[in-house]
């Protein structure tokens, strides 16, 4: 009789578990506001991204003598919050912000253009296939289609930002202020690098001699940077030929790199060095700990319309990101959200599966 009771209890437990699991539909809604709905898989995508962001923050805050391996993330705090709580709050907050972006864009009759959507699709396809994103998201219930939707929706933020602060926008920033921010936070330089890792002392000496010869040739006018670049990289004109629209704006210095301050998307360790150089000046930097060499040739950013134009939006963000973020946060507070806890609480931060190192 006792055995029969035990069997009945076990069967009941299994049936209960199966029933509970079966109650979660594939496209169940987790967050709603107006006509905008987000599925539980969409929320899970936000949770995974928040978890990655949190772990990155923890790693950045480690002391120099602390190991980056086997970190007990869940024992850490971020901005005064326990790790799990921070991840959960950030994920939900990001979903709400996306709802705000989409709502505001709809009111302003704004939609993503075909080029943006196509670029996102290409990005997703590339990283899903080549960078193991499929092994990260799929085991956690996020399909490629859901990830692509999340990425596209995130672009509504930039779309509305441009609507407000872009040229002709409701809160347009003056061209003078934009250019001032551009020239304050970015410089343009031709850059050639040599990595000394795994190099013998003899190879290092040879590279130093080679780079010093480039400095001499550049300063004397014997060689252009293009010639130096091709010689060092072993490239030819044929290999670099590309078909481009003849009317398309092209850079004056096609080999140049944008070097930015730490607050930009172009943050560079060599920004300060390049900033102090005169246009046309050549400088050879020997990296600390004999890590390598960097050859810089300062270029005139102000004279290169291609780069000035491409840095326009980045400069506007530098000037107005804080204001925009405050505006969105206030807007979110005024929105009515329905949070379906049943659909959200099924996901646990500590249960997020990460791809194995051997995958």
Predicted feature locations:
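Bacterial N-terminal signal peptides that target proteins for export
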Residues: 1-8
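Soluble non-cytosolic domains of exported or imported proteins
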Residues: 82-86, 90-99, 111-118, 146-155, ...
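Sec-exported extracytoplasmic/periplasmic mature domains
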Residues: 48-55, 92-111, 125-133, 152-169, ...
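N-terminal targeting/tethering segments
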Residues: 25-142
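PPIase-associated folding chaperone regions across multiple families
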Residues: 136-206, 213, 265-359
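Peptidyl-prolyl cis-trans isomerase
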Residues: 213-268
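C-terminal motif of bacterial Sec signal peptides marking the signal peptidase cleavage site
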Residues: 18-22
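Short acidic, Pro/Gly- and aromatic-enriched capping/linker segments at domain boundaries
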Residues: 23-29, 274, 279
